[in-house]
Structures are given as structure tokens and as C-alpha cells.
């Protein structure tokens, strides 16, 4: 018989949605715990392609933070600390006698010689290759491919590993939102170093302003504090040459202190145009059949040359200064070109390269490293043995017992970020800093009206294209004229409120 009454779907729909709400996270956790699916994405977009929207969305929402190690307790943390303390060396320098340390993140930097199918008409990165030949260098294992700069950066600055975090997680946007975190900056601050970040992109990208405060940096000069006039050929990114002068400002601002300056480039950032952009490019490629990809590779290798010129300008400028200095430079991940393991001479798309430079006559000691080991290795070579995690790597990273090494790192990492901080005796040894934006002081020296009264001129120092004018805490439209002059045409209402 046919039912002719109304069918009520609402209750069924709500029950079904409730079931999905419960079932999907449970299924996600089971799948991860049994290794059916990945619990960490090195490339979020690729992860969505591989595992689909439902699992990927569920895992990025549900799977955050670190799982508590089964053996996490005070005694086991103290045992790890005791092992480190029995082997660690004493720091032999301080914030006056120590060398300046410069760390340079080379955005999406990949040595073209590492790509099996790619041929370039001439070497676009001769400075890089010269430094690789003459100073300590090696492969660098990074946690991401094609994107996710902040996660390589997190590993490098903190010595902590992304392998313990959730699917597609950015610690800058999760745990570091509310928790301070020991880093190379806080470690060096303890012995008197001044610590800086210089980056020609937006300060709030990846929530960096907050993260750098949580990691203990003193200053952060982002593009908003720079007078940027030159951009890459595709118009997307500032060129990197401005970073040299901005980095020198960090040294000049603290003449009585040694400096740690972290430089983040952006000129080689994707996307890479599949249409010709550079007229008569100096560097051309072969070995790529698709015309669009050939154009993309041509653009990329020419931008690599710009990065190489930046490296030369930086090291040339440092050579002129009478200060002991060591520089470490590394690629944060491979470019977004769809590279596979088989395309790489290393056989691994998670391997980039790092190089160094110094004016101290340090011996060349090549080693392949993980990103979270890089600065422990660098500081070790100059007699700096500070910090819980950096000392852990310095004493344990060459252990033949890899499992024990990773287990110890897991314990300390959980203890610092999510646990009771037994390794700090329960105290907050590395509180967040009062981060100062920029080196140059921005100030207003005078404000005057035009003769007609419809324009207000603001005079001062160190204005940029990103400077904003506020009247009574309300932003008004303004125009940048120079580093010393802005003007605005406030509305009659704004004028009344400013009286």
C-alpha cells in the first residue's frame, strides 16, 4: 500500500548529522593510529588530493598538538636532562665576545644541479656553489614540500620537530598563540646577544609577529617598516636586495652587543608564471617538454640568480666589517613545481641544501642535517652551548641509537609545549619578549594644514608606503610622499573630532 501522509525528515537528518559528527573524528583517529593514513601533511593541498576532503578536513580540525608520550613523567624527563648535562660543554663566549650569527632562509631555493631532468645554459647560482665548495655545507631534511615555510622555520628556530604535530598543523597558529617557546633567540639572549628578524613580506603572515615574540626575539623588521621600491618581474614580491641594508641596521643598532639576525627572503616565492615574463632571459632551460612548465622553470632559475646575487652582496658587505661573523643559509622547501623523488639526485623531495660562510677561519665540516639540528650545529662550531633543546641536539644528534634520540626529543618537546615543564623545574624560563617592530624609530615631528585647509601634512621620520594615519583612533585615507612626509584629506567629521 502507498503511504499518502507527510514524511518528517528533520529528525532523521539531525540524527544522521550527529552520527557523522561523532563517527568521522573517531574514524580519523583510528585510521591515523593504525597508519592507514598519514597523520602529518608536508603539503596540505597534496594531502587533500591524496586523502580527500572529508578525512583531510576532519584531521586538520581534530588532530592538533602533540600526543602525550606514554613514558612521559618527571623522572624520565630528568633522566634525559641528566644524560645531556653529563655530556654538554661550557659556553666559551658571551654577548660581547661571541660572533655575530646570521641565519638566512632562502625561499623555495633549490640547486638546479639537483634536478635530474633540468639543464640550464649556464650556472645561475655561482656564489652558492663557491660557498658550498669552500665552507661547511650539506643536505637539509625539511618537513614540508612546495609550501609551509613557517614549519621549516619553526623547526630551525626552536630545534623542535614537526613530526609530532597534527595533520597540516602550523604551530605558529596553534600552540604558540598562547604558549611561549624556547628558541635560538631566547637561548642567545641569555648570554647577552641581541636578536632580530628581517623579512621583506608582511609581518602578520603566518602570525609571525606573535610567534617571534613568543620565541623571545627583540626586534622584527617586516616590509611595513621598509621603503620597498623594487619588485620581482611578476610583480608579486619585493626583491631581496633590500634585506642587506636592513640586516646591517641590526648590527649598527647594537654596537656593544653580538647579534643573531634571522633573514627571510621572498624573491623566489611561487607561483611561477607559465607565460613568458622576462624579456630575453639570461638563463634558459631545456629538458622540459611542456611549454608552460618551461616558462615557469625559466622564470624560476632567473630568480635563483637574483637570490645568488643577494648572497654575494650580503657576504661582500659582511667581509667589510671588522666583526667575527658566521652565516648559515638554507632552502626552506623545494619550489611548487610538482617534483617527485625520482626527479631529484638526492632521491628525496624533502631534502634541500644549506651552505655557510664565515670570516673566522673555521674548518669545513660537511654534514647532512635535519632542519631542527641546523642551529645546534652552527652554535656548536663557535663555542655556544645554551638551551635545553639546542644542548640536547649537540650532545645526542650523533648517537647511534636513533630511536632513543627521537624518544628523548619527543619527551622534551612535549614537556616544554604541553607538559609540566619538568626540564625547567616547573618555571617559565623563557617568557615572551616585548617585540619591537623595526630598528628605525618612526615619529611625527610636525602636523600642518594646507592653505585651503582641506589637506593635512604629517612630517616625521621613517615613514613607508605602508604607514597609516589615524585621527582619534580611526584610520583615515592617507598618501605617502616620502620617508619624511605623509598627507591626508580628513573629512569634516574627522576634523571636528581632532579639535
What are these regions (language model features)?
Residues 89-96, 103-106, 111-483:
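Solvent-exposed soluble domains appended to multi-pass membrane proteins
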Residues 487-494:
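Conserved small/polar residues in nucleotide/adenosyl-binding loops
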Residues 1-99, 119-139, 174-178, 182, ...:
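N-terminal secretory/membrane-targeting segments
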Amino acid at each position: 500500500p502507498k503511504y499518502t501522509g507527510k514524511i518528517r525528515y528533520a529528525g532523521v537528518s539531525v540524527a544522521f548529522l550527529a552520527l557523522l559528527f561523532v563517527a568521522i573524528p573517531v574514524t580519523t583517529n583510528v585510521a591515523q593510529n593504525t597508519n592507514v593514513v598519514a597523520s602529518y601533511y608536508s603539503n596540505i593541498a597534496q594531502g587533500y588530493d591524496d586523502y580527500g576532503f572529508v578525512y583531510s578536513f576532519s584531521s586538520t580540525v581534530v588532530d592538533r598538538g602533540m600526543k602525550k608520550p606514554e613514558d612521559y613523567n618527571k623522572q624520565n624527563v630528568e633522566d634525559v636532562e641528566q644524560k645531556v648535562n653529563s655530556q654538554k660543554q661550557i659556553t666559551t663566549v658571551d654577548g660581547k665576545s661571541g660572533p655575530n650569527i646570521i641565519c638566512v632562509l632562502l625561499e623555495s631555493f633549490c640547486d638546479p644541479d639537483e634536478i635530474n631532468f633540468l639543464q640550464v645554459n649556464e650556472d645561475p647560482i655561482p656564489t652558492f656553489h663557491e660557498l658550498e665548495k669552500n665552507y661547511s655545507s650539506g643536505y637539509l631534511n625539511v618537513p614540508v614540500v612546495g609550501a609551509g615555510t613557517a614549519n621549516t622555520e619553526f623547526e630551525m628556530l626552536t630545534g623542535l620537530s614537526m613530526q609530532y604535530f597534527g595533520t597540516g598543523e602550523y604551530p605558529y597558529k596553534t600552540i604558540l598563540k598562547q604558549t611561549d617557546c624556547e628558541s635560538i633567540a631566547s637561548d642567545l639572549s641569555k648570554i647577552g646577544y641581541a636578536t632580530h628578524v628581517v623579512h621583506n613580506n608582511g609581518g602578520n603572515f603566518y602570525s609571525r609577529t606573535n610567534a617571534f615574540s613568543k620565541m623571545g626575539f627583540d626586534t622584527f623588521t617586516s616590509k611595513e617598516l621598509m621603503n620597498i621600491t623594487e619588485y620581482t618581474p611578476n610583480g608579486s614580491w619585493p626583491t631581496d636586495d633590500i634585506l642587506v641594508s636592513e640586516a646591517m641596521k641590526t648590527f649598527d643598532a647594537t654596537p656593544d652587543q653580538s647579534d643573531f639576525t634571522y633573514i627571510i627572503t621572498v624573491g623566489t616565492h611561487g607561483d611561477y608564471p607559465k607565460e613568458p615574463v622576462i624579456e630575453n632571459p639570461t638563463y634558459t632551460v631545456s629538458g622540459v617538454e611542456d611549454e608552460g612548465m618551461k616558462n615557469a622553470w625559466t622564470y624560476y632559475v632567473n630568480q635563483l640568480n637574483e637570490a645568488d646575487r643577494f648572497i654575494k652582496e650580503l657576504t661582500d658587505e659582511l667581509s667589510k666589517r671588522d666583526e667575527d661573523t658566521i652565516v648559515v643559509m638554507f632552502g626552506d622547501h623545494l619550489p611548487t613545481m610538482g617534483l617527485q623523488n625520482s626527479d631529484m639526485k638526492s632521491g628525496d623531495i624533502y631534502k634541500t641544501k644549506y651552505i655557510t660562510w664565515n670570516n673566522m677561519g673555521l674548518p669545513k665540516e660537511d654534514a647532512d642535517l635535519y632542519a631542527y639540528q641546523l642551529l645546534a650545529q652552527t652554535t656548536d662550531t663557535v663555542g655556544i652551548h645554551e638551551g635545553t633543546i639546542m644542548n640536547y641536539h649537540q650532545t645526542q644528534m650523533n648517537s647511534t641509537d636513533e630511536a632513543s634520540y627521537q624518544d628523548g626529543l619527543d619527551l622534551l618537546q612535549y614537556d616544554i609545549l604541553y607538559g609540566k615543564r619538568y626540564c625547567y623545574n616547573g618555571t617559565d624560563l623563557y617568557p615572551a619578549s616585548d617585540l619591537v617592530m623595526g630598528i628605525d624609530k618612526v615619529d611625527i615631528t610636525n602636523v600642518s594644514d594646507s592653505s585651503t585647509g582641506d589637506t593635512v601634512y604629517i612630517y616625521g621620520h621613517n615613514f613607508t608606503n605602508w604607514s597609516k594615519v589615524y585621527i582619534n583612533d580611526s584610520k583615515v585615507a592617507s598618501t605617502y610622499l616620502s620617508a619624511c612626509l605623509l598627507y591626508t584629506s580628513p573629512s569634516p567629521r574627522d576634523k571636528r573630532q581632532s579639535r
